[in-house]
């Protein structure tokens, strides 16, 4: 997770005349630029955005802390590695770069318009293949959940014949360390198989992650195990777990879990392993892009409807949400002094997605959920239904992806009150054609990278630190088959994880600094004699991907550029355009306060 303290700092980035990028296929360095603001050089983050491409004096360049960090090399990624270092260049290099920039501008003129103005970014719909043909045939990652008595609870690969053996071995290892050292084992790595095991002791339940992925640290795996524990607590409170195992040490926890609970566990593990899931790595929520007046109108309707419910004792309704497809938050009604933790909401969204996957859209649910960050010893009760019924004329407008309406109460017997509130709210919303039309457009036609004038950008993720929410364009892939789309998500996941890992140490040690870091991945083109994967039209294209991460007190930006030659000056210019676009569209991209009572 990338987090910054709230403060204003001016980001100083050297101009192209001061610093450039050199690529060495044998190198594994990542160039990073950090700067700490002094009292005589403080400006708003917007000022830093506006002047990011300005030339700096030599004295200013001396204040720039140029650092490099090593990035591990993974053989499972076809020898793909980050290769970038930062250095200063002389005046002749600046002339060459100016010529290169002029040539690039001429090329832009020939592609886009006669006057050289770039109205739409040039982008490709695919990224080059980065995985070995057989890299996904073996299990590269697994999660185990079992009790202190060695009773299995869950394994990511339930049919894996080695799961029972693994759990028995892991239980023995844990017991040995507890007996010999009176301490808990945290992690170990097998040298022969290069498998890392990370342990999380939440007695009476143990969680273990097994991973061959070199780009995952122990802290990342441990955080994933903590999230799994949070989900288990959402089904059985901490008090209930303690009571169950006090009665019987060898209690079988699986008997208290529903089939949908195991489905949700599998979905969580899949998100951690194969899917692009920024919600977890950024510790935030994705918000549906919606016009500010429409969102405000929905919030007003939610508040006014609550005020009309005369038979509602104070505190009956705690929270209400409207959630769009793909776990995108649309609207929220909450108390003025309270809000739910992102982890609690992520669990809620995952539960909703799993529950409605097996139900018809006109069904309603009444589910007890423990939100561990809110209160790990008690339940809240969630009334959940879709806003549209299949019989409604407006339902077909969402093409099977209607938004979901959630009402949360602390009272176990408040079902009919929650139902009454949601029914009345749904009637008002469905009668408003403008709201339905805008919701449909936002849900079914999310914005893409082509809507932002940022040349050569393939994809980005922008997190607003103030809102604890992020936004990203729809995935830029033409893959129609699930397998190809899954491969595309794995590529994005690998690149974004590498970007975040490249600044993890700097973020932890330099909390008062803004940071820009570049990572470049390079690999020679495959020869004709090498094996290639089927259905991959870019297999012969050499990998030359540039990524950028920009952290400031106000935002975090993860950015991937098209495969090919992209200079750092072009990258900074496009990054600035994206930040400006996100800031100027903040009211439609993020929820500020929501409706409060």
Curated annotation (Swiss-Prot):
Molecular-function GO term, any one: phosphatidylinositol-5-phosphate binding
Localization: Endosome, Multivesicular body membrane; Prevacuolar compartment membrane; Vacuole membrane
Disulfide bonding pattern of the chain: none
Region (Disordered): 33-62
Keyword check for Membrane: yes
Annotated keywords: Autophagy, Endosome, Membrane, Protein transport, Transport, Vacuole
Composition skew (Basic and acidic residues), residue ranges: 48-62
Ranges annotated as biased composition (Polar residues): 33-44
Membrane topology category: Peripheral membrane protein
Superkingdom of source: Eukaryota
Gene Ontology cellular component annotations, sorted alphabetically: cytosol; fungal-type vacuole membrane; Mon1-Ccz1 complex; multivesicular body membrane
GO biological process, one term: protein targeting to vacuolar membrane
Similarity comment: Belongs to the MON1/SAND family.
Role: In complex with CCZ1, is required for multiple vacuole delivery pathways including the cytoplasm to vacuole transport (Cvt), autophagy, pexophagy and endocytosis. The MON1-CCZ1 complex acts at the fusion of vesicles with the vacuole, through its regulation of the SNARE complex during the coordinated priming and docking stages of fusion, and particularly at the stage of tethering/docking.
Protein name: Vacuolar fusion protein MON1
Native source organism of the sequence: Candida glabrata (strain ATCC 2001 / BCRC 20586 / JCM 3761 / NBRC 0622 / NRRL Y-65 / CBS 138)
Gene (UniProt): MON1
